[in-house]
Design a protein with these regions (language model features):
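Primarily short, surface-exposed interaction patches in extracytoplasmic proteins
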Residues: 1, 29, 68-356, 381-393, ...
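Extracellular structured ligand-interaction cores
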Residues: 5, 35, 187, 304, ...
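A structural supersecondary motif
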Residues: 365-368, 376-386
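C-terminal or internal capping secondary-structure element at the end of a domain, subdomain, or sheet
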Residues: 465-466
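Sequence context surrounding c-type heme c attachment/ligation sites in exported
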Residues: 1-70, 375, 387
């Protein structure tokens, strides 16, 4: 409940409520009780993480498939049991079943080994249903919420009702209960207040996140903290203007996106000239950087998707169940909970078939306890906490992953195969095609000469790998 409360406050309101779990906020006008008043909106929530979210037709197909697998598993297991029974029946003295392998002939051992291998393959071939997290209200089981002394559940103090931050809304709100509804209306009341003009935070927080996504820096540099300890807005009038535009347009995100990308600010170059750098030094780095797109590396997801796209490996799809990537043994060993054979979908790890792995990163499963190693190398944040702004590091493992990783190597091989199929004999055309496919431009004279020299002793695959490792490919300009 604390995570839910604090994530809602940070993501939607730009407020840090973690301090208020134990005491009044040290800097912001948020009281100890405000945390628990906000938490009370979720008091009637119940969770279920074993609800199948596949389409009914898909669920039926999965169950039919698993029934066939179970029948085959039963058949193979029966053949193993029969061999063991035959071995035990030959003995003149009673032998424990677990020692039957010691008494088998070489032929019987081979038969059992083959059957056990088939059994393991059949078990791996079973397809689990895709489970989702479901949240719902129960009218008859609303737990009272108490202010906890120092955040300790063993020392409850005063009971509280659902309420918004008291600095803005000191009175207890009237809960909205839909007609003929069996829910409490608490979450609906909170949602309506968040998306209303009575709430001065949500619109600012949303437009600031959109601005940050385009320019690399938000108008407020701390997107999850609009309080006293957070950064001041570099251009408060701009922030309020965009917030008003969002509300006046009926909370249309499309309108804000269009407003930003059609502005002259968005059309500025990423790299500034010498005079502009001098202006930056006099006006302050963040204030200047806010109004110009920053040269920055693509996010982990963007970089992976770009590699798959330029190589032609990307599987275009819209919607569908998540894809479970293949993880190395070291990653799985570091998370023993996912290796439990009896675990449910939310606890285990079930790699999808190789033919389904090259989808957009949007469709890769995300678990709180595990980060995909390749993407973690490129600063994929932890899944357990809300991340307002990603850090961008430059470390050696990133270069190694791009140069030696299976994703980059496989992509370079596919690009080279495609080019050789189109222009098998002309190295000049191969160079131009590689540049156009990977960097979306032709090489200049110096680059072309260097590539010609490179191909005299190296392969086209290696040239494609080099182009995938350029800053021009990995960075957004």
């Amino acid at each position: 409940m604390s995570d839910l409360t604090e994530t809602t406050a940070g993501a939607m309101l730009g407020l840090t409520m973690s301090c208020c779990r134990c005491h009044d906020h040290k800097t912001d006008p948020l009281s100890h009780a405000d945390h628990y008043r906000l938490r009370a909106f979720f008091a009637a929530c119940h969770y279920a993480d074993d609800v199948a979210i596949d389409l009914h037709a898909d669920q039926k197909a999965i169950r039919n498939h698993n029934q066939k697998q179970d029948a085959e598993i039963k058949r193979v297991q029966k053949s193993i049991d029969e061999i063991e029974s035959t071995v035990l029946a030959r003995q003149t003295v009673k032998v424990e079943p677990k020692k039957s392998k010691e008494l088998m002939t070489s032929v019987e051992l081979a038969q059992v080994a083959m059957a056990e291998s088939e059994l393991e393959s059949l078990k791996k071939g079973k397809r689990p249903l895709t489970n989702g997290l479901l949240m719902h209200d129960k009218m008859d089981s609303v737990q009272p919420i108490f202010v906890l002394f120092s955040g300790d559940h063993r020392t409850p103090k005063d009971a509280v009702e659902p309420g918004f931050p008291s600095v803005l809304f000191p009175n207890t709100p009237i809960l909205v209960k839909p007609l003929k509804s069996t829910t409490t209306g608490r979450r609906l009341t909170l949602a309506r207040w968040i998306a209303s003009r009575e709430n001065p935070w949500a619109a600012r927080v949303i437009v600031n996140r959109i601005w940050q996504n385009y320019f690399g820096n938000g108008i407020v540099a701390t997107p999850n903290d609009f309080g006293v300890t957070g950064a001041l807005p570099s251009h408060p009038e701009l922030l309020d203007y965009l917030a008003m535009e969002l509300m006046d347009s009926g909370w249309s995100l499309k309108h804000i996106h269009r407003l930003i990308v059609t502005s002259s600010t968005y059309r500025q170059q990423t790299v500034a000239d010498q005079a502009t750098h001098a202006t930056q030094a006099t006006r302050g780095g963040h204030e200047f950087a806010t109004l110009r797109t920053q040269l920055r590396r693509k996010s982990a997801e963007q970089l992976r998707d770009s590699i798959l796209h330029v190589s032609g490996l990307l599987q275009e799809r819209a919607g569908g169940p998540p894809v479970w990537p293949v993880l190395d043994d070291a990653t799985l060993a570091a998370n023993p909970a996912v290796l439990d054979d009896n675990a449910t979908k939310t606890k285990g790890w079930y790699p999808s078939p190789p033919s389904e792995q090259s989808v957009r990163s949007l469709y890769l499963i995300q678990k709180r306890t595990i980060r995909i190693p390749w993407m973690e190398t490129f600063d994929l944040p932890e899944n357990a906490v809300s991340c307002g702004k990603r850090e961008c590091s430059l470390v050696a493992p990133q270069s190694l992953a791009m140069m030696n990783g299976s994703l980059s190597v496989q992509a370079a091989q596919r690009i080279a195969e495609t080019i050789l199929g189109d222009v098998p004999s002309s190295k000049n055309q191969q160079i131009h095609t590689a540049f156009r496919q990977i960097l979306l431009r032709n090489p200049n004279d110096q680059e072309f000469a260097s590539c010609r020299t490179f191909l005299e002793s190296r392969t086209l695959v290696e040239l494609c790998l080099v182009l995938l490792n350029t800053n021009e490919f990995a960075f957004i300009e």
